[in-house]
Each structure stands twice: as C-alpha cells, then as structure tokens.
C-alpha cells in the first residue's frame, strides 16, 4: 500500500528544491543582479508562490454543509415521491432522526419484531456465572 506524504512534508520538499534551484542558478554578483526579481524566478522554471500553494489552500477550504430546510428537501429528495414522511419546514436533523426512528419502530411493532426483541433482552434473574468461572468470594450471598 502506498503512503501519501503530508501537506507539510510536500511544502518543505518544495521549498528545499526551490532554494537548491535558485542557488545553482546564474550568479547574482554580476551586473544583472539588481534586475533579478521575483518575475525572473519563473524564467528559471520555478513556479510562482500562488501556483505552488493553490492545492494547499483548496484542500483546507471548508466545504459548505447542506441546509436541511423544507425548500432544500426537494433538491435532495427529502419530500419527493419516494420519501417516507413529510418533513415540516424548519425542523433540525435531530428531530428528523427521531421521527424516522419512531416510524421504523412503529413498523417493527406492527410486525411483532420489537416485542420479540424486548422479550429476548429482558433479564428476569441475576446473571449466573459461567460453569468454568471461579466463584466470587467477595460478593454477598
């Protein structure tokens, strides 16, 4: 499985090669050294700072969260013909989940699934230890 380097590692590597390329370029002590500005760096094949960090900025940019309101529900299929329930405008996600849960539990209760589950989960007596487990001498009898 291939490993993906972190953004900081990529940025540090980019800066290392940029410094190495500038130092191995033409000498800056000649008569043209005063004319060597940032635009001249691009002529040496070095990317501009804005071009080298565009991916970094876009990676950490926040993604907008969908607004779950009545008018937005139709766009994501909330109140469409295939939806399970009509959602009133202005409800939040928590109440929507509770409504879905109660509807599903109601459907399960109609089929008897919930009652069978509840009956299997009820504990009538104190749980007994396993056959091979040693007795707890510290517990009251």
From Swiss-Prot:
Residues 95-105 have a biased composition (Low complexity). Belongs to the PPDPF family. GO terms for biological process: cell differentiation. This is Pancreatic progenitor cell differentiation and proliferation factor-like protein. InterPro entries: PPDPF. Pfam families: PPDFL. Residues 72-141 are annotated as: Disordered. The gene is PPDPFL. It comes from Bos taurus. Residues 112-122 have a biased composition (Polar residues).
